[in-house]
Amino acid sequence: MIVLRDSSDYSDSEVDLPSIEVNGERGNVPTSVLCNVEGSLLNSNPALRQPNLKCIKHNQDVENTTFQLDLRGCRVPSSQPQVITELENNIDIPKNIDAMQNWIFPQTQQYRNYQKEFCEQALFHNLLLALPTGLGKTFIAAVVMLNYFRWFPESKIIFLAPTKPLLLQQRVACSNVAGMSPGATAELNGEVSPDRRLFEYNTKRVFFMTPQTLQNDLKEHLLDAKSIICLIFDEAHRATGNHSYAQVMRAVLRSNSHFRVLGLTATPGSSTASVQKVVDCLHISKLIVRNEESIDIRSYVFHKKIQLIKVTISSEMNILKSDFANLYRPYFNFLRQKKLIPINCECLNIKAYTLFVSLRKYSFSSKNVQSKEKSKIMSCFTLLISCAHITYLLDCHGIIQFYQKLVETKNKAEGKGSGQSFWLFTSKPFAFYLEHLHNKIQGLSLNHPKMNHLLELLKEHFKDTSEGYQNQRVMIFTEFRNTAEYITTTLLAIRPMVRASLFIGQANSAYSTGMNQMQQKETIDQFRAGVINTLVATSIGEEGLDIGDTDMIICYDASSSPIRTIQRMGRTGRKKSGKVFVLLTEDCEDSKWERSQVSYRRVQKVIESGKKIALKKDVPRLIPSNIQPIFKFQALQNNADATLILNSYNNNSSSLSPVNTLANQAHSRSKRYLPFIVDDVFEDMESNLRVPTEDAKIKRFKSDYRSCIYNARRNVFSKPTYMGDKLTKFAKVPHSLLTLSIYRRGRLLQQCSPSSVTKYLKYEEKFKRKRMKKTSNALFQST
C-alpha cells in the first residue's frame, strides 16, 4: 500500500500497487512520494526497478527533473516545487516517550484558562492564533517551545521575528516563561558570521532568528531543514507572497513535512482573501481568532474609550486647495471627456483610490492597444494620482507637508524630462503657484486644525500635579515621518509638561535621518522609565516592539487598514482602562475610518463563523497515536535574565571557540575603504602567486566584487582563444588566471555530473565584466 500526495493540494489517496522484486527481494513500493524515478514502476524492466529512496533536494538545478507518480504508477512532472518525505507512521524522529506522557503548563501568578486551551491546540495542530495585543501570545509560544524541547531531544525549535529589535525582546520573554538558561538559546541574525551560526546550530537547539537569516542558512545548507520540529512566526500576517516568511516555509517543506507551525498575530488580515493567503502559506490546520469582545478573554481586557474628533480645514487651506485643483483640472477634464472617470468624482476632492480603480479598468480594456493616445491617458492617470495624494496631505496633515511634497514632485518631474507630470510641474503657472505658496505661508499659522486639538488633549491629560503626569504616558501615531517631526517640534512649546520624543525607523528620507537600533532602544527605555512621557511614532511603533502600556493613544491620521488601526489601539488598555482619540478631517478621513471598521467587522465575522477559509487537512501528527499527553501544572525555575542574555550574546559574537577561523578574523577587522582599482591589483597579484584549491575557487567566485559594472562595455573574452596553442604576446585575457583554470576545469568535467559542471560555470558571467589586461607573460609561465 502506498499513499500518494499530490503536490498541489496535499490530498491523500490510497492505491494498491503490486509488489516488486529488487535484488532478489520482494516488497511494496517505497513510501517516498516525490522521487527521481527512471521510468514507470509498472512498465519498466524489473532490473531497473530499484527506487531512489533519497528525496530530491528541490532547487533550480534539478527543478525540471523532479517527478511524482500518478495513480497508474507513471511518472509525471511535479506541479509545485515541494518535496514530501516519508509517511507519518514511518517517520524516524528521535522522541522522548517518557516526556510525551504529559505536557507542561508553567505555574504563574495569574492563571488564564484561554491560554491553557490555546496551548493545547497549538501542540497538536498548525495553529494561526490571532489575539489582541497584551493577552499573552508570547507566553503561549513559550509553552509550545518548552514541550517540543522536551518531546524531541535532538530536534530544533526556531522563533522567527521580522525585525532584529524583536529578537532580544522575544528571547528574554520566552526564556522567562520556559525557564531556559541564556546558554540554551541563541539569537541569530545577519550580523552573526556564518561560521558562528554553524557552531550554534551544532551546539544548541532553540533559536531566535530573522527570517532572512534562516532562509539563507537553509539555502547554503548550514542548517538541515529535517532537523526542525517547530517553527513559530511572530507577526504572522506578513506571511504572504514572496515575504521571507513565505520563502522560509517553502524551503522547509521541500524536505520536511513533519514539523509544527505556530503563527502569532493581532489581526490575521484585512480581508478574507488575505487571511486565506496566510493559511495557505503557513499550512494552517487550526485557526483561532479572538477580539476584545470575545467571551473567553473579555474578563482580561480593560475598557478602551474611543472618541472620534472631526475637524474642518481652514479657509486659507481651502483657497490653496482650490488653486492647486485649477492647475490639474485640464487633465481631469480630458479623462472625463473620455468617460474614464466616474461621474460622481469631483476635481476638487479627487481620491487616489478612485483613480487607481479607473486606471486598472482602462488597462485591462486596452491591453492589446498601442497608440499615442493610450500613452497620454496613462500619463494623465499617473499625474492625477500624484495630485490626489498631494491634496490628501494638505487636507489631513498641513501646509508644510503639502509644500514639501510639491517640491519633491517637481524635482522628480524635472529629472524625468517627459510625460504629463513634466509639463505640469515645470510650467510657468505651477512655478508662480509654488512661489506664491512659499511667500504666503510665511505670514500664516502653519498649524493644521488637528494640531490645536492635539495640544488641547495633551494639556488636559497632563494638567494634574507633577507627580501625576510623571506616571502618565501617551503615544501619538502618524503615517508620515515629516508629520511626526513637525508634531515633535511643535510640542517643544509646552515642555516640561509634555516631554516628547520622536520614534521612527532606520531608513533615511529626503529631509531627515533615521534612528538606528541603539537610538530606538534608548528611546523606549526612557519612555518606560518616565524620562519621556509622550512618544510620537510612525508605523514602527504599531507592531512588535514591547513599548509598554500607555494611558492614552492619539491617532493623528486614520488608516484604511484595519490591521494598523487595531495595532495602534492595542497599545493601551493592557493593565488598566485607556483612552483612544482619533483625529479625522471631514469629507476626507471619516470615510476611510468607516471603511476600515466595516472591513474589520466583516472579516472577524467570517473567520469566527468558519466559512470561506479553507484549512489544511493533511497536517501530520508528530507524536505516536497511542500516546495522549496529560496536562501537568508545574512551577518552573526562572533562569533567564535580560542582562545575562545580552552579555552572553555579545561574548559569543566576539569569541568563536572551535570555529575561530581566518575568515572570521577577517570579518571582524575594519573595512578598507580603497578605490576598487587598488583592490583589483591586489587580487591580480594574489591570484598569480598561489594556486587556489577547489573550495577557494568557489569562495572566491562568491566574494563581493564591488566593481560589478566595471568594464561592462568592453569586448568579452573569446573561449577558443584559451584552447588554442598559439597566443600572441599581447593577447588580451581576463585579469585573473582563475578564469582560465576554471574554464579548462569545466572542459575536463564534461564526463562528470551536470551539477558539478554547473557549480563552476555558474559564476562564469561574473568574469565577463572584469577588465581585460595584458598578462601574456604570466600566462606563458603558468602553462
From Swiss-Prot:
It is an enzyme of class 3 (hydrolase). It catalyses: ATP + H2O = ADP + phosphate + H(+). ATP binds at residues 131-138. Residues 118-286 form the Helicase ATP-binding domain. GO terms for molecular function: 3'-5' DNA helicase activity; ATP binding; ATP hydrolysis activity; four-way junction DNA binding; four-way junction helicase activity. InterPro entries: FANCM/Mph1-like_ID, FANCM_DEXDc, Helicase/UvrB_N, Helicase_ATP-bd, Helicase_C-like, P-loop_NTPase. A motif (DEAH box) lies at residues 234-237. GO terms for biological process: double-strand break repair via synthesis-dependent strand annealing; interstrand cross-link repair; Okazaki fragment processing involved in mitotic DNA replication. Pfam families: Helicase_C (PF00271), ResIII (PF04851). It is found in: Nucleus, Nucleolus. Keywords: ATP-binding, Helicase, Hydrolase, Nucleotide-binding, Nucleus. Residues 450-619 form the Helicase C-terminal domain. One of its GO terms (cellular component) is nucleolus. Its EC number is 3.6.4.12. Belongs to the DEAD box helicase family. DEAH subfamily. FANCM sub-subfamily. PANTHER family: FANCONI ANEMIA GROUP M FANCM FAMILY MEMBER, FANCONI ANEMIA GROUP M PROTEIN. This is Putative ATP-dependent DNA helicase fml2.
